[in-house]
Amino acid sequence: MSDLKSKRRNAPSLAQHTYPRRVSPENSVTLRHHRLARDASLQANSSRSQAATSSPRRNSSDESHDTGQSDANKWFDQSNLNPTANYDSNAMDVDPPFYQRESESSNEGGKIPYHGGSVPMLKPTVTHSSSADDYRSVIDDLTVEIQRLKEELKRYKQFGSDVMKNEKLFEIKVHGLPKRKKRELEATLRDFAASLAGTSSTDMASSHKKKSSRHMNRMQSSASGSMSKHASSSAGSHSRPVDSAYASMSTGPNSSGTSLNRPSMSARARTSEQKVENYLRDIPEGLYPRHMIMTEKERKKLIVRRLEQIFTGKMVRGANTSNSYQVNSGLTPVTHDGQSGKAAGLHQPPSLKAPPINVENIEPAREARILPADNMKKSRSRDNESTSNSNQDQTESGGKTANSGSGSNTSPPIAPPPEQRPTRPLDLDPHRTQVPSENMEYLRHLGLVPPELLPDSNDLEGDVAPDADGWIHLNLLCNLAQLHILNVTPDFIRSAVNEKSTKFQLSRDGRKVRWRGGLDGTRFSSDSSGDNSQSPVGDETDSSSKNGQRKKRKVVTADGQTTSAPSSKEASKYDRQISQSSDSFHYKPLFAHHPSSHETSLDTGSSYGPPEESAQGDSRWGLSGSGGTSQRKKRRVDGAIVYYSGAPFCTDLSGDPGDAGVDSQTGGISPATYMQNAGQAQAKAEARAEKGKVPPKAVRMVPIRSQSGSFLPHRPLTAFSPSTEDVPMSDVDEAIALEDDIEMEFPWSDSQQYLEVRPLEPSGLGGVLPDDNFMVVVTTKRPHGMEPGEKTPALGRTKSDETTRTTDSIVNLLASMSTSGNENMPAGRPVLHKTGNIEIEYLSGRIKRLNPVPLPPPAIFFPPFSSTSSYNSELDLGSDADDDESSEEFMSRRANPHQSDNEYPDDVDITSGDEVGEEPDDELAPTDDDEEMESAGDEGGASRGRAAGPRSARPSLPSGKSAGHRAVRRTGSLAATAGGEESGYSSSAEES
């Protein structure tokens, strides 16, 4: 072992002789560079420690530093010859070529080279990919969280309308509550919120009075001496008449002392703001813009109902929508003491009469007061005396009298006008309750219907003479009925009144109408179903009593108005009419989804209204609340139910799929029950048809979709079931009775079938007269439910035999008809015809003569070379035609100039027009010789054939020729010849 170590120790010396190219260790370049790199690393570590303790920047004493300039060549050599000396893992590999090295003045001794790359301030920022990915993931998570919080905040901040934000009372959230229980809770909370109508305003006013009581006392004490001075001046300044119905709220007797109540300006501002909010809140549903999809007949009926409602006072639908707002909106009719109720009662039902109401307990009226009818009869000129008397009555009823400061008045005394309130949206509701007495009073005030010329009560149902008075401009009634909402023209309104109304009399010029009298409007056929009922709630007409007097219970409401209530037998009908609203003017979905066995169509339906469209807890389309819910239940949001102070409705931001057609308040059927499936509607229609109430043809078939979504009643690619046509077979009066001993293995139809009569284009068929225009009516019999692949033994023939038999049957049929006239075919030998796999049996047939047809224009005209040759050829053709009377000649006859114009087969009759050379009878009217037929088969066939050929008194060649063809209907009927359209052409007009 020791020898081996000694050999290794002496190895470098031996290498000199063994390897002459190896140099000594002292002269080795690798070892020298290694030493230099080690020394450089030591110097770099020392300089790094010095840089951490002392700053290379300028000191606070503003002494300059010694700087040295680096040479580019020196930097290049140092970087290439000593690459490891400048290596630092946290710095750049080399220094820049012109880096200014800095050194402090306090440094002693040799200058240590300073490497700026080791200073952190001069290092470039290095981005680590791992840390960037971590930050990116955090940013993504925060973004998702922010989006989720935004959605949640949006869900919680759904306040509905901003107008009602100040009236917000409370809000609740419901989780997992059944729909019926939720309806009950909503109804209870709505009643509670509606009962707090004046609580908030009263508390606010009381607190304001407590705070300003001292100030009010001081103001009253200081203004007590000036009250007498300002009384007369204020009364005189506010005594000017106001003719407009939109009178300002500051006018009237109550506003005489407004200058003294300065501290109550804030309360007035709050009151005015509340009035504006109430104005915007009470917008009725009838004023919302909507697109109505109605037919022309429905629109005319609606126009007539609107016009007759002015005189009858009977609502079309939804009478309860405006009754609940009568107290708040001031729609309660005010009956004045001097009003003549007898004249107004002629056009007012007994249930709509209201007793006199104390004027002090209600708010001011919107309309300007009209003088009573008695005063108008006594004095039409409205002198000062009547004006002063009426004004005195008004001041006494208002409880305020004017203090006259002066003893004598140079001008007539003018009392302040009665107070008026501004017009509210509910006053313009087209579905509001109409009071006929007020409407008649307004028309009398305009001088259009004098009271003495109104029809008496005993002559209500009689007609009105056209020269009597009482005509009213139709434009005025259209404005009163607000028909501009329906977007109809005056001409359309005139046509509706003329066609649909039985209570209006239209003038000759169409500008005026007159009410014929009566308590009820026009009754339409659709009113019997109850959907389009014109009668108001509890006011159905009785056919037994002409004057409409019925025994009903009268209920006095809170405002003193009497309404008639139905009996217990009419409870269901009463509730059904209560729940009906103006949903007929809103959009209804065209397609109703078919419900499953455990879910109705209302559960999967949707409410299409905005959140502000709720009234009385039900939306326009019969769904609870007012929020819209989507058909996809995954997108539903559990929002809050917001209740407002004094509002009889709530805002349900979560939505409600709706009940199964039951109203929570009345217990009746909701208006949304019209969304029923097509199967139930079809069953009801068929049941009514079976009972005999509706004829079978009047039953409207409800389209039923198939699994593929098609409305077609048959599948043309899978089954052969020819569709029936709309043109009835009017030519056949009665069908021929079938023999009783015929046995069939397949079902037959005995009902009358509808045929299609297709006219043929005119063609110049050679040798056929224009009068030869006829139609072959054939009675056929065929199976109804035979399968496509089923065959009978009698039909097992070859194709050639079938074609031959078909041709022979047609020829024999025409030959028999030409020889025997209109006699029927023998029933013992029916003609069988096979089309595909369906057997067709021809029972009988006849020929019906039609009007002549015009000739088509000639395609090619050849002038005759000589009259003699053409005349001889025509004579030859005529002689051949006279000799041959076979069946083929009947199909295509040759032209014969010597034949008479009205020459027909012996046994075939002609019409009266053909006998005298005049125009024939009507084409569609059957002739005298047409035999009565009865369609006993499943489908009768009729085809029309017309043949036309050139005729002339001068013998010549035919102007146009074409090959004759037979037209066979797809149902099996046949046509003898090809012809053209009917035009009443007569052959006598051709002769010159």
Swiss-Prot record:
It is found in: Nucleus. Pfam families: FRQ. Residues 1-112, 199-276, 320-433, 515-637, 783-804, 872-992 are annotated as: Disordered. Coiled coil: none annotated. The keyword Electron transport does not apply. A motif (Nuclear localization signal) lies at residues 550-554. Residues 1-10, 207-217 have a biased composition (Basic residues). Residues 877-888, 915-937 have a biased composition (Acidic residues). Keywords: Biological rhythms, Nucleus, Transcription, Transcription regulation. Residues 59-68, 363-385, 421-432 have a biased composition (Basic and acidic residues). The keyword Secreted does not apply. GO terms for biological process: circadian rhythm; regulation of DNA-templated transcription. Residues 221-239, 525-535, 944-960, 975-992 have a biased composition (Low complexity). InterPro entries: FRQ. One of its GO terms (cellular component) is nucleus. Residues 42-58, 69-89, 247-264, 320-332, 386-412, 559-569 have a biased composition (Polar residues). Belongs to the FRQ family. Circadian clock component involved in the generation of biological rhythms, in particular in rhythm stability, period length, and temperature compensation. Behaves as a negative element in circadian transcriptional loop. This is Frequency clock protein.
